[in-house]
């Protein structure tokens, strides 16, 4: 277990409830899904599996459970990031964030910096915090101009289209991928399907399904889902999130959103390492 940066520790039951409330409150709907993993931020990091655990050969039950646990941890992290990007922080979510514990060392410098910024900010909240965060959310992600350079716009199309416009080719591509996996945005989601929150939520859903498949002994389905995740990481997330998170560092002012930028960038690096080991 990694060293923690806060003294607030949640029980296993509380952590599981936090995960359901945080990770499950996003814009995708996928029918019946496995429950979100009951883990906390101290457990999220590189999985450390070797090739024999992830290869085509049949795994032992212990290896399957270890890999399933890694997918559950990944799903938790994707869900947390997705919720932070989806909408402003509300009172309930702020309380959940305050109760969370964060690792002091993950082995990734960007993630470590992100956790330090988040923990520091959450440790000094007051009555003005929600307003401050709402203002910063607008500043960072919505902006005040009419061109494509007034904020870190949270849409893949803005970062991959020549004119930095929304609802371009990237949106059509991810929509097709969502539908291929039986996932669609929920009725109350009004933004484009290539919003960062939905792309992260999609990865959460796939990781949950991979964990479920492993728990059920379906290694072939787990391997297929892992390949879908690797392709989505390579073809979409890696194409724009590094630049997007750098832009967040320009526009965001609070340590919560600055920390979110670093945490996202670092987790993307960890995911690349994970996929190199297991996919």
Where do the PLM segments sit?
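Surface/interface-facing alpha-helical segments and adjacent flexible terminal/loop regions used
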Residues: 2-10, 15-36, 48-279
